[in-house]
A protein has these predicted regions:
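Loop-to-transmembrane alpha-helix initiation sites
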Residues: 138-145, 159-170
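N-terminal signal-anchor transmembrane alpha helix
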Residues: 1-26
Length: 200
């Protein structure tokens, strides 16, 4: 029951759509009508600029951190925290308040990892940041970040079956949601950060 409560609590926190709220408050626009149509960090950077994009990034990280800490404290369970983080990602990707049209959950995934096990989060963040810096492909960094997640859990949590299942599912879903980006990466048509081209 504690895991179910954690997921539900996380879901409602995840429905707090930072990009949507920031865009409405500052530019009076629906960010889903601009750029890629995504309510996430990358689209916020492209549509709203770096400062507001980073505000979105921090907000999406913090809601996952908050959910993990609340669940872990409330139920005295590290695993409950992971379930809450998963709930945030689900809520971010499919928020009922925006007719289930949200982002791709990468910033929230990072927040979940940093709160669940900072070692995994830090490595994932470093690898993703380096990839983005070298290639300017945010999608590549995002894919690497979520790929590292179950690998880190496998290494640091031997016997942690539920942890491995949860993080593997989240990674698979995140990669699937980047399928269009992967296609463009293969064709050499993917947008580079800081370069205006087609929407992603």
């Amino acid at each position: 029951m504690s895991y179910l409560i954690s997921i539900i609590m996380g879901y409602f926190l995840g429905c707090f759509q930072t990009a949507y709220i920031v865009a409405k408050r500052t530019k009076h626009i629906d960010i889903r009508d601009h750029g890629s149509g995504n309510s996430g960090t990358t689209n916020a950077i492209r549509v709203l600029g770096w400062k507001l994009g980073m505000l979105t990034f921090v907000g999406d990280i913090l809601k996952a951190v908050l959910a993990v800490i609340i669940a872990r404290t409330l139920f005295e369970s590290q695993l409950a925290g992971l379930y809450a983080g998963a709930g945030v990602i689900i809520g971010h990707n499919w928020p009922f308040v925006l007719k289930f049209k949200g982002g791709k959950g990468i910033a929230s995934t990072l927040g979940m990892l940093l709160a669940f096990d900072w070692r995994i989060g830090l490595v994932a963040w470093a690898v993703a940041s380096l990839a983005i810096y070298l290639t300017r492909y945010v999608s590549l960094g995002s894919i690497l970040l979520v790929t590292i997640m179950p690998i880190g859990v496998f290494i640091l949590y031997p016997g942690g079956t539920q942890e491995l299942i949860i993080t593997s599912i989240l990674a698979i879903v995140a990669i699937y949601r980047h399928k269009a980006n992967i296609g463009r990466l293969i064709r050499g048509e993917e947008n580079k950060l800081g370069v205006k081209k087609q929407a992603t």
